[in-house]
Amino acid sequence: MGPEVELPAPPSAEESTKQKAAYDASSQRLEDLIRAQNPGAGAPPPVTFEALVQQFYISAMIQMGAGTQEGQRPRVDILGARNTIDLLAILAEKTKGNLTDSEDRMLQSVLFDVRMAFLELTSMINMQAMQPPVPPPPGKK
């Protein structure tokens, strides 16, 4: 690792409390505005640990080409997928012992699923890389 970077002092408890109150008020005004524009819209889903894990899962799967429309070529970001999977692993490591059984099972299942998808994708990429190049049709170079 490189040299330690000196970080600024964290905000005081009072500053954090004021900032959180302002954030909550601003979020509520935004929600009220959206509901006024679209009265039939339901409330957004609650922000939970499961929603956070699901967000990482969806990101990793999309980065590995899932959700591609039929007939379109998948857009794969294998390095981005690996980074997202590594973030999930860090989340699992840093929250170990602090999750409910349900949260832990979900996180472990998601990690298993995205790692398996990653292994399948990298296996396919390796197989393609090992195949000899297709020669051009006669008369083309």
Which role fits each region the language model picked out?
Residues 22-141:
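Long, contiguous alpha-helical segments
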